[in-house]
């Protein structure tokens, strides 16, 4: 669902700026069975974000955010990436927005 905010995206001259890059993209076992077989795998994405608040420099930050989704180990990563990446990105966007807007 779309986010409801009065903020508007502008190409330049904005009060807030976000920059960032993906620093980690990893799939690893997240749960094993009693006989040591992987039951669930976890796709994790980590991003480093530089947030600049032109109105209050004290609110600016450089932070790392990580979000993940688990998937059944019987499925290949290539089968689930298209489904999981949008879910993970949505979590990252929410976390980053909340961190930048926490004192509004």
Regions found by a protein language model. Give the residues of each.
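Compositionally biased, intrinsically disordered linkers/stalks adjacent to structured regions
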Residues: 81-104
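Surface-exposed helix-capping loop/turn segments at secondary-structure junctions
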Residues: 4-9, 57, 98-104
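Surface-exposed short loop/turn segments
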Residues: 4-5, 13-60, 68-79, 90
């Amino acid at each position: 669902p779309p986010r409801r905010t009065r903020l508007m995206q502008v190409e330049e001259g904005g009060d807030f700026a976000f920059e960032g890059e993906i620093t980690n993209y990893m799939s690893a076992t997240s749960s094993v069975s009693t006989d040591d077989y992987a039951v669930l795998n976890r796709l994790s994405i980590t991003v480093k974000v530089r947030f600049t608040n032109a109105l209050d420099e004290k609110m600016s930050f450089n932070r790392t955010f990580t979000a993940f989704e688990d998937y059944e180990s019987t499925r290949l990563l290539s089968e689930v990436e298209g489904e999981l990446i949008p879910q993970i990105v949505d979590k990252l966007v929410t976390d980053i927005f909340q961190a930048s807007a926490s004192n509004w």
